[in-house]
Amino acid sequence: MIYEGKAITVKALESGIVELNFDLKGESVNKFNRLTLNELRQAVDAVKADASVKGVIVTSGKDVFIVGADITEFVDNFKLPEAELVAGNLEANRIFSDFEDLGVPTVVAINGIALGGGLEMCLAADYRVISSSARVGLPEVKLGLYPGFGGTVRLPRIIGADNAIEWIASGKENSAEDALKVGVVDAIVAPEKLQAAALDLIQRAISGEFDYKAKRQPKLDKLKLNAIEQMMAFETAKGFVAGQAGPNYPAPVEAIKTIQKAAIFGRDKALEIEAAGFVKMAKTSAAQSLIGLFLNDQELKKKAKGYDEVARDVKQAAVLGAGIMGGGIAYQSAVKGTPILMKDIREEAIQLGLNEASKLLGGRLEKGRLTAAKMAEALNAIRPTLSYGDFGNVDLVVEAVVENPKVKQAVLAEVEANVGENTILASNTSTISISLLAQALKRPENFVGMHFFNPVHMMPLVEVIRGEKSSEEAVATTVAYAKKMGKNPIVVNDCPGFLVNRVLFPYFGGFARLVSAGVDFVRIDKVMEKFGWPMGPAYLMDVVGIDTGHHGRDVMAEGFPDRMKDDRRSAVDALYEANRLGQKNGKGFYVYETDKKGKPKKVNDPAVLDVLKPIVYEQREVSDEDIINWMMIPLCLETVRCLEDGIVETAAEADMGLIYGIGFPPFRGGALRYIDSIGVAEFVALADRYAELGALYQPTAKLREMAANGQSFFGQASSEV
């Protein structure tokens, strides 16, 4: 053994060939944490010191190659002063450069996922051979960063600036075939032939058949582009990528600027430019929020996995209520492999549900995401029915009928009488109390809420609602089924609106106050979209449905009359009474025309001003900053209350619920991280400035206590890649 550590070993194989193997003890994946980087330095030094070494192959002892850097270490590292961070980054990069500069040929055998620093390690080798099942990429832009272990330097010198920009700015994972096509790897082989292929390649390099020094040299030189080529490659790309990413996500454009700036230099100077730019990105609020979001997502997945031990497998599902929602649920279940019955009392509703599922499957077929055989298999997994005849062997039923407690109770009681004693019933409701609905059931322990978001196939969140009598097995099984459907489940406790709608309606409450204060709703939409929301509140209300919003507002007002009840007529009342229901009937705050693709397109409608005139009670001068605060303070404070009330267990779940459920701007990290970014004490002071607007703007006693004690919602990182 030439070197043995906790993450890396180096052993002799044959004829001067050694294997440097990554296998981080106690972990399911390899990653570049401090330990691994330090051992890589020692391993490279050990290889350099051994005169008998003629070539190195790099392998992984795990199913993946290396998933990247240990993101949990970022949180503390990025708090360091810039100069210290740059120095640390350059020190890490010297390790990769020392590996690259070995006086013998090097081959990396990529057996599985190689992302971020994992792929950057591969780029430092002379040759790369990949398993046909492996995937590679540089996803750092998704964290508000860009590659910091030499990726912006080596990749463009290996595959050209255009291809490198596409790989780095998109942050996509790429197949082995795509990697071979652009030249990221030199060969692709079947998984079982990977080791043999790597050995063959290194032997041919040692023998001189392949000139490894000539292969290495372009990575050490400046980028081979003349001035015109540089302008075409970089200036065009910057404009296009800026349009795609938007102003709130600077990392992709900054990555291009770094590649451009470093293009005229050799490797070592180029790495210095990369390090300075990487650290600049690490200090942005976008990076801090997106890293927090990543860690929250990992925590969410861990929590969901924690239910696996108690969960029963859902082999057969059913959905009550066809139509668009039922069809969407049926599609999602079937396409992910769980057969599902789709029941309704009307044949036309069944047809509507089947049409919805067929349309969604057809869309995937057109985009190449599904084969014709898989589409047929998924369609066959959806069995329409008008009766309960086949419900005896169903493991879980999703009730998705009209949002009316009496109707839901009647349907749930009826289905309970037609299923097995252990069958779980889950109500897809957005606001109605699960404990209230459970009163109609003989086995309330088998009943939970399962709130899907519309459109089902696109929205990643499912709220699993625990009622007063819901058993742990019922909750766990529903969580497992949601995961099986490809969704991100969050378990919440029962209350009006649960988590997402309970938080959303105070946001709408802020909007209603602004409109009643004479602020143009089009301006409000523009300000909130600029803030980072995918759509402004007026447009969102139109998409949700004015009638749905009207009903939800009343439910929330009944549940929380102290702060959500408003006796004055609002914009939603005025539109509802004028039968302007939003996109569903072509007119709400906006009117809707059909575009060339058959999708609704919003258009301003002067006539709506007459409808809204009676609910404008004053004319206030408000700044754009005021608009943001009128909207965001109620949303943030209600999120705080949900956490304090135990509706949601952790700050991470609360924030991810808002990002996945209502499109909270990801680069701001979620409501609680947004408070942290302002500072809890500063946020409380900000809310107090708007206290005259009512109870929605009143911080809780506990939040004031946090402010006084200098506390925050997110302390140390607790999850790993």
Curated annotation (Swiss-Prot):
Keyword NAD: yes
Gene Ontology cellular component terms for the protein in this record: fatty acid beta-oxidation multienzyme complex
Binding-site residues for NAD(+), renumbered to this chain: 325, 344, 401-403, 408, 430, 454
CDD domains, per database record: crotonase-like
Organism superkingdom: Bacteria
GO process annotations (BP): fatty acid beta-oxidation
Keyword DNA-binding: no
UniProt-annotated catalytic positions: 451
Region (Enoyl-CoA hydratase/isomerase): 1-190
Subunit structure: Heterotetramer of two alpha chains (FadB) and two beta chains (FadA).
Function text: Involved in the aerobic and anaerobic degradation of long-chain fatty acids via beta-oxidation cycle. Catalyzes the formation of 3-oxoacyl-CoA from enoyl-CoA via L-3-hydroxyacyl-CoA. It can also use D-3-hydroxyacyl-CoA and cis-3-enoyl-CoA as substrate.
The protein's name: Fatty acid oxidation complex subunit alpha
Organism: Pseudomonas syringae pv. tomato (strain ATCC BAA-871 / DC3000)
